[in-house]
From Swiss-Prot:
SMART domains according to UniProt: CPSase_sm_chain
Keyword Transit peptide set for record: yes
InterPro entries recorded: Anth_synth/Amidotransfase, CarbamoylP_synth_ssu, CarbamoylP_synth_ssu_N, CarbP_synth_ssu_N_sf, Class_I_gatase-like, CPSase_GATase1, GATASE
Role according to the record: Small subunit of the arginine-specific carbamoyl phosphate synthase (CPSase). CPSase catalyzes the formation of carbamoyl phosphate from the ammonia moiety of glutamine, carbonate, and phosphate donated by ATP, the first step of the arginine biosynthetic pathway. The small subunit (glutamine amidotransferase) binds and cleaves glutamine to supply the large subunit with the substrate ammonia.
UniProt entry tagged with the keyword Glycoprotein: no
Location(s) in or outside the cell: Mitochondrion matrix
One BP term from GO: 'de novo' pyrimidine nucleobase biosynthetic process
Keyword field: Amino-acid biosynthesis, Arginine biosynthesis, ATP-binding, Glutamine amidotransferase, Ligase, Mitochondrion, Nucleotide-binding, Transit peptide
Catalytic activities: hydrogencarbonate + L-glutamine + 2 ATP + H2O = carbamoyl phosphate + L-glutamate + 2 ADP + phosphate + 2 H(+)
This protein's GO CC annotations: carbamoyl-phosphate synthase complex; cytoplasm; mitochondrial matrix
Protein name as catalogued: Carbamoyl phosphate synthase arginine-specific small chain
């Protein structure tokens, strides 16, 4: 019996898969729903690669950007609102997407942070799925995935062979892609692909003015952290304030080096695109790390793009990965303890570990592709990770790194000269806005 099962499984794996078969399965899945499937044809094209036809269930627009894939089984609202996906077309490997709908983006937690999203809007410019669920069920859901995409102006295509797309990207490497709705594919339009890597995407997602999020009212004398916003996720801010820290968030190019002495710690956030676009941020960090002896013990923590910017500030280099790491189940080894952690990741660039200066050593390593996942200073309280300890979505194995960082911040504050309070004026801080400023998505650079 087991031999027969194995033989049938082998036959199924070797059977040819066509776009037509996926379109049929899409129609069969959605036909049982309460809403009708869109009859509008759509095309997903990889530059210099295959063309996939399907059905549109999002906004009626043509978009172009970097095609990337995520293997996360859940968490599509969090992924789609993650600013690190700005300018990208997100391919989901999970076969059925949208079955638990989309929660409200207006609900907030006790700190005033968005409860279910990682930013106020969808950040990817398009999504590609095998099956899109038109029937959804969850107690937090207020609309379907398709309705959300239409309202946010995001192109979405279903009924395509996502396994073939991922296989191509994995073997050929990162590629530009385009979603066309209601039009036939025209090979002469291949020159119309837009490369978001040539755009400073951080400028698009960073707050335009400083804003402040206070710790809980019952926290006495809270720590005060300066956050450099390169596209910070809501759950990163929540991970800090829920541990008793007040945070002031600054635009990515803000001269933080001029006011760093007012804070108990510096944090550099995640964000989209090529880290070399953020030259001023790198110079500001380098000034804090190497040119201000009075800040030599100031704790600094960076995540994702923040990790890469810290590495650049230290004199290291970054490289573009073949197809990036975007998943919720990537093993990372802590080189200081020998422990393995399952991590959430979303990045297309990595730090070249061979270029790290002598004062830094590798902190974590990716056990899948051996790429660098973090660095730590040999003497100062400075460390960073390529993965996301805050998850959302994904495991919380490494959330203890926030505790480690805030422990260093507590030590730094305690060691400061007694009787000298250099922290920002509380009245001025309280007058700051309480949320991101000027990051509304009113125009895309990559919509044709």
């Amino acid at each position: 019996m087991f031999k027969n099962i194995a033989r049938l499984a082998s036959m199924a794996r070797s059977a040819p898969r066509t776009t037509a078969s996926f379109q049929t399965r899409f129609m069969a899945t959605t036909a049982s729903g309460t809403a009708s499937a869109s009859a509008t044809p759509a095309t997903f094209t990889l530059q210099n690669g295959p063309v996939f036809t399907g059905r549109s269930f999002g906004a009626n627009r043509v978009v172009s950007g970097e095609a990337v894939f995520s293997t996360g089984m859940v968490g599509y609202p969090e992924s789609m609102t993650d600013p690190s996906y700005r300018g990208q077309i997100l391919v989901f490997t999970q076969p059925l997407i949208g079955n638990y709908g989309v929660p409200s983006g207006k609900e907030t937690d006790p700190f005033g942070l968005i409860k279910y999203f990682e930013s106020p809007h969808i950040q990817c410019i398009g999504i590609v799925v095998a099956d899109a669920a038109l029937k959804y069920s969850h107690w937090t859901a207020v609309e379907s995935l398709g309705e959300w995409c239409k309202r946010e102006g995001v192109a979405a295509i279903s009924g395509v062979d996502t396994r073939a797309i991922v296989t191509y990207l994995r073997e050929q490497g990162s590629s530009l892609g385009r979603i066309t709705v209601g039009e036939e594919y025209d090979a002469e339009e291949d020159a119309a692909f837009v490369d978001p890597g040539e755009i400073n995407l951080v400028r698009r997602v960073s707050t335009k003015q400083p804003f402040h999020v206070s710790a809980a009212a019952d926290v006495e004398n809270p720590l005060h952290i300066a956050v450099i916003d390169c596209g910070v996720k809501e759950n990163i801010l929540r991970s800090l304030v829920s541990r008793g820290a007040s945070i002031t968030v600054f635009p990515y190019e803000y001269p933080i080096n001029d006011i760093a002495h007012h804070f108990d710690g510096i944090f550099i956030s995640n964000g989209p695109g090529d880290p070399t676009h953020c030259q001023q941020t790198v110079l500001n960090l380098r000034d804090i790390m190497y040119e201000k002896p009075e800040l030599s013990e100031l704790p600094i923590f960076g995540i994702c793009l923040g990790h890469q910017l810290l590495a650049l500030a230290a004199g290291a280099k970054t490289v573009k990965l073949k197809y990036g790491n975007r998943a919720h189940n990537i093993p990372a080894l802590d080189l200081t303890t020998g422990q393995c952690h399952i991590t959430s990741q979303n990045h297309g660039y990595a730090v070249d570990v061979n270029t790290l200066p002598a004062e830094f050593k590798p902190y974590f390593i990716n056990l899948n592709d051996q790429s660098n996942e973090g660095m730590i200073h040999t003497e100062k309280p400075i460390f960073s990770t390529q993965f996301h300890p805050e998850a959302k979505g994904g495991p919380l194995d490494t959330s203890i790194l926030f505790d480690k960082y805030l422990g260093q911040v507590h030590q730094y504050r305690a060691a400061r000269k007694s009787g000298v309070d250099t922290r920002p004026n509380k009245l001025l801080v309280d007058l700051l806005p309480k949320q991101r400023i000027g990051v509304e998505i009113d125009a895309w650079d990559y919509v044709q």
